[in-house]
Structures are given as structure tokens and as C-alpha cells.
């Protein structure tokens, strides 16, 4: 297994991952789709451990999109059970690895049981100072921007602020990800080359990395390869390279 060079790399502060390909991985092995999701939890453990070792500021994982509610109810029920199980089983690890848990997305469609486990894990990790582990559950970029717009519009209507106060900084502070650095590197597994309504505001200047590997087979070396690719890219943010 390749060791992780902690000091020799230009590391991203914030990595966001679209964990795609669980179902395809399972179907290719004549397994039920839910077995792909179950195996995917092992990969979650792998990348969170590595993010903690590297002392990344934040790791955001796309667990359930706001569009995923269109899936069969049995699969959705299993995903919710898997999330609960993960939070219970990994609570101590998250705490001991000095990680902080954060949840982004809607809460009104999640069960009380899921919300309770999220709250418990947030509580035991809230004073930690290491990597922030952000779980995007019932999350969609358009939904987030719509909720933020309504919130600011309500504040203007109620006289709490003026239109002139609405700036990029205020928008940033009003999103689910308030206080987090913008995404530097977005990784998508599973072979599809699209962003799927994920962190639309936050990935404005992110480097995008797509791999054909499905999420259950994404390993430490694969994460390292994405980080190596990021380290070799020139990030211009609309400007020019020095000497260009």
C-alpha cells in the first residue's frame, strides 16, 4: 500500500466527492444494488481516514441528492439505515481522529432516527479541531441556492437588511457550507463526467477529477492519484500564469 506523503504535496484545503457507481459495481458482480452501497461504506472509511491523516480542512461527501428520492423506496430505506449505522459505528472514530461532523442539505424529509444520530455525532465531535467531515444528505445545489435566496429575500422584506448589503460574501455566509473554504478539488467516481447539481456555488474554481472506477473499488492509491493530479495543475482563478 502506498504511503501518503504529508509534506511534499500542494494539498487542497477542501475536497468534495461524488460517490458514484455503487449500483453499477454491484450489478457487474450479479449482486443486489444495496450490496454496492454497503461496500461503499468501506471506501468512506478509507477516504475519511486519509483526509484526517493529511489534515485537510474539509472533506464533503455526496451521500444522497435531493433527486435521489425518485429511487425505489426499498433502496431509500436501506440507504437511510446504512447512514444511521455508519453514524453509530463511526462516532468514536470520528471523535478520536479529531474530526468534526457537519451535515448539509434539507432536514424536513429525514426521519427522526437519522436526525438523532446526526445530532449525537455532531455533539461528540463539535470541539474537535481537525478535518471537517461534511455529509451532504438530501442535498442539491439548486435547492441550497433557492433556500438561501428565500432567506435573504425574507430578511430584506422584514427590514432586517437592505438589498445593498447582499454581496458575494453574504451569500457565502448564508449557504449550508458557511465557514468552509471553497472546494479546491472535486472528485467523481463511476465514469460519468458531470457535476450533478453538487455544490454549484462552492466549486466555482475547483479542479475537477473524474475516474472510471466505481466508488466501492476506489482505494487509497486512487485518492492519492487524484491529489497528485491536483498538485500538478496550475490554478489561475481567471488570471495568467506567472511568466505567461
Swiss-Prot record:
Needed cofactors: Mg(2+)
UniProt keyword terms in alphabetical order: Magnesium, Metal-binding, Transferase
Source domain of life: Bacteria
GO BP annotations listed: polyprenol biosynthetic process
Cofactor note as given: Binds 2 magnesium ions per subunit.
Record: active site: 20, 68
Gene3D superfamilies xrefs: Decaprenyl diphosphate synthase-like
Transmembrane segment boundaries: none
GO molecular function, one term: magnesium ion binding
Positions bound to substrate: 21-25, 33, 37, 65-67, 69, 71, 188, 194-196
Residues noted as binding Mg(2+) in the record, renumbered to the chain: 20, 207
Annotated EC: 2.5.1.-
Family as reported in the entry's similarity comment: Belongs to the UPP synthase family.
Oligomeric form and interacting partners: Homodimer.
Function: Catalyzes the condensation of isopentenyl diphosphate (IPP) with allylic pyrophosphates generating different type of terpenoids.
The protein's name in its UniProt record: Isoprenyl transferase
Organism expressing this protein natively: Rhodopirellula baltica (strain DSM 10527 / NCIMB 13988 / SH1)
Amino acid at each position: 500500500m502506498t504511503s501518503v506523503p504529508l509534506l511534499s504535496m500542494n494539498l487542497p484545503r477542501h475536497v468534495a466527492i461524488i460517490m458514484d457507481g455503487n449500483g453499477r459495481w454491484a450489478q457487474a458482480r450479479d449482486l443486489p444494488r444495496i450490496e454496492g452501497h454497503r461496500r461503499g461504506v468501506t471506501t468512506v472509511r478509507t477516504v475519511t481516514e486519509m483526509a484526517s491523516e493529511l489534515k485537510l480542512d474539509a472533506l464533503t461527501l455526496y451521500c444522497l441528492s435531493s433527486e435521489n428520492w425518485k429511487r425505489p423506496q426499498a433502496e431509500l430505506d436501506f440507504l437511510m439505515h446504512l447512514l444511521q449505522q455508519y453514524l453509530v459505528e463511526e462516532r468514536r472514530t470520528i471523535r478520536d481522529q479529531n474530526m468534526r461532523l457537519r451535515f448539509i442539505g434539507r432536514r424536513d424529509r429525514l426521519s427522526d432516527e437519522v436526525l438523532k444520530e446526526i445530532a449525537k455525532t455532531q455533539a461528540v465531535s463539535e470541539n474537535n479541531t481537525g478535518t471537517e467531515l461534511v455529509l451532504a444528505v438530501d442535498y442539491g445545489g439548486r435547492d441550497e441556492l433557492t433556500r438561501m435566496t428565500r432567506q435573504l429575500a425574507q430578511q430584506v422584506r422584514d427590514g432586517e437588511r437592505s438589498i445593498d448589503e447582499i454581496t458575494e460574501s453574504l451569500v457565502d455566509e448564508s449557504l449550508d457550507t458557511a465557514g468552509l473554504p471553497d472546494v479546491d478539488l472535486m472528485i467523481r467516481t463511476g465514469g460519468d463526467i458531470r457535476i450533478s447539481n453538487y455544490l454549484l456555488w462552492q466549486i466555482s474554481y475547483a479542479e475537477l477529477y473524474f475516474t472510471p472506477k466505481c466508488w466501492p473499488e476506489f482505494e487509497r492509491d486512487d485518492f492519492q492519484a487524484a491529489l497528485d493530479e491536483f498538485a500538478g495543475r496550475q490554478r489561475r482563478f481567471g488570471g495568467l500564469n506567472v511568466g505567461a
